[in-house]
Amino acid sequence: MIDFFATWCGPCVLLASELEKVKAELGESVRIVKVDTDEEATLSTQLQIQGLPTLVFVGTDMEKPALRTEGMLPAEMVKNIISNEL
C-alpha cells in the first residue's frame, strides 16, 4: 500500500494513525510505503495524485490493477480492501 500524504494535511495525520492500527493487526503481510507529496512533487504529478490523503493498494497478483482511494478511511475499511480486493 502506498500512502500519499502531506504533513500539513489534517486527514493525512488521522489516516496515519489508522494505518498504524492496520499494520499492528496484519503485521508483515502488509507493507506501507509513505510518500510526502511536497517532497515528491514530480512523482505525485506523474501519478496524478490530486486529493489527499490518497492510498494506492497494490497486491501480489500483477494481473489485478492497483486500487486507489482518496480521503480518510478507518482501519476496518482499509483491512476490508486488503482482504477483499487484493
Enumerate the predicted regions with their spans:
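Hydrophobic/aromatic anchor residues within beta-strands of the central parallel beta-sheet
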Residues: 30-32
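Typically the conserved alpha-helix immediately C-terminal to a functionally engaged Cys/Sec
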Residues: 11-27
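The canonical Cys-X-X-Cys-His
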Residues: 9-12, 55
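Structural microenvironment flanking redox-active thiols in thiol-disulfide oxidoreductases
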Residues: 22, 35-45
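A short glycine-leucine-enriched loop at secondary-structure breakpoints
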Residues: 46-50
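Hydrophobic beta-strand core positions in alpha/beta domains
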Residues: 3, 23, 34, 56-57
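Non-catalytic, surface beta->alpha helical segment in thiol-disulfide oxidoreductase systems
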Residues: 51, 56-86
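Short active-site neighborhood of thiol/selenol oxidoreductases, capturing the structured segment around
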Residues: 1-7
